[in-house]
């Protein structure tokens, strides 16, 4: 599985990218190697948001989580997927 990470109003540091890759990397065994997971991290005044979209043969698997901390949002998105 390939993971593409982008950000809106966010400086994507190595620590944040590594955390996303680590958490979503655990899901690789459930998807084909050519599957591309798209991750968008964004910040609003009151929340830090992660959106994960994974296309499948039958549609999409999608998770969106918003908390006051990116790392908590990443954990929740992993659990949702």
Residue ranges and their predicted role:
Residues 1-81:
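N-terminal, polar/charged subdomain of small-to-medium soluble alpha/beta proteins
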